[in-house]
């Protein structure tokens, strides 16, 4: 999908074809790249997208780098294509942050991109392959705020102090959630500098957080875009409305941003999410609402205890034998718990149900 967009519009810079929603998703997707795999230390230095792409290709030409179980490996091909197109190649990457803290139960990563038109794009990474990252996602159901939301706010305010000019903010999955959180909770002076916020299939918030949000005028600049069969993006509460994009995939696989359909410089939109997405959303929502905060915490601890007992740090660490053992263990749970736990585990590993095949 992205290659088609870059092939169509990649020869046009932002003065010839203004920044659009597909550009925003492409740049938010860049946040999934592990920039510690290139020579330039983007935590303290800068590099253009062209330089980053060239360094990556030179250092890893003979390797098959895996992005993890949930992030498509084509993410690295995207960097290569971007590095060779006038639209993206001279954009400057900087202020890379990548933090995993098991004790704090935090997974956070972000990067800032100088667009070259006097504005910056802050890209927040969504949940990656780490088990601690997914536990933080589940913690959102009973804990507010979670560490990555606070870190996203700190990062925005740090960048706003360092850089002059306007900002666009975006992220996919949890990255979209923390982008909205940062924009909504920062001060009015920084909010005035935010041009737009994109939440691409990111989960919503607990009612406590929504009640605290001082979105004000910034709410008019927040756009939430989800695929037809959105599961992740329908979790928890959304105060803002959302737009629905067509996807070439089915079910939970539509969370893969590479499957979203586009026409020229915009997404192909549909009227609403699918009936199956409504059903999954209703099931999960009813289950979440049926428990108090203490019960939710106990449920999350129970679920992730099953995963961490294997010794795995990432979902990719789980081999077939361990996956089958986990499924067997989940089958011993009480009927209602078993249904939700199994659904959650399938979601994490992108294991389709018979209805999705």
Regions found by a protein language model. Name each.
Residues 170-175, 179:
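Gly/Ala-rich beta-loop-alpha elbow adjacent to hydrolase catalytic centers
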Residues 3-120, 124-139, 143-166, 187-357:
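Alpha/beta hydrolase fold serine-hydrolase catalytic domain that processes acyl esters and thioesters
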Residues 179-188:
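Short glycine-enriched nucleophile-adjacent loop
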């Amino acid at each position: 999908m992205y290659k088609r967009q870059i092939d169509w519009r990649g020869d046009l810079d932002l003065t010839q074809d203004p920044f659009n929603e597909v550009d925003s998703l492409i740049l938010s997707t860049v946040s999934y790249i592990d920039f510690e795999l290139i020579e330039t230390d983007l935590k303290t230095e800068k590099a253009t997208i062209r330089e980053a792409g060239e360094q990556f290709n030179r250092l890893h030409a003979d390797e098959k780098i895996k992005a993890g179980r949930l992030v498509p490996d084509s993410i690295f091909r995207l960097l290569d294509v971007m590095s060779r197109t006038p639209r993206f190649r001279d954009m400057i990457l900087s202020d890379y942050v990548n933090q995993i803290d098991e004790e704090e139960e935090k997974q956070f990563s972000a990067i800032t991109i100088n667009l070259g038109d006097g504005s910056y794009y802050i890209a927040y990474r969504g949940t990656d392959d780490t088990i601690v990252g997914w536990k933080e996602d589940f913690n959102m159901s009973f804990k507010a705020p979670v560490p990555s939301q606070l870190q996203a706010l700190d990062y925005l305010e740090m960048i706003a102090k360092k850089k002059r000019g306007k900002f666009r903010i975006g992220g996919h999955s949890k990255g979209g959630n923390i982008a909205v959180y940062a924009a909504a909770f920062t001060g009015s002076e920084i909010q005035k500098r935010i041009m737009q916020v994109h939440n691409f299939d990111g989960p919503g918030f607990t009612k406590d957080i929504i009640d605290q949000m001082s979105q004000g005028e910034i709410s008019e600049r927040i756009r939430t875009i989800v695929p037809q069969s959105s599961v992740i993006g329908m979790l928890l509460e959304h105060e803002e409305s959302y737009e629905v994009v067509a996807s070439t995939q089915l079910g939970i696989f539509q969370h893969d941003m590479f499957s979203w359909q586009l026409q020229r410089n915009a997404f192909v939109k549909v009227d609403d999410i699918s009936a199956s997405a409504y059903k999954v959303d209703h099931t999960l929502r009813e289950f979440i609402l049926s428990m108090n905060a203490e019960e939710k915490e106990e449920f999350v601890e129970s679920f992730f205890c099953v995963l961490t007992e294997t010794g795995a740090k990432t979902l990719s660490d789980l081999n077939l034998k361990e996956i089958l053992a986990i499924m067997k263990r989940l089958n011993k749970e009480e009927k209602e718990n078993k249904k939700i736990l199994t659904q959650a585990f399938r979601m994490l590993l992108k294991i389709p149900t018979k209805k999705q095949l």
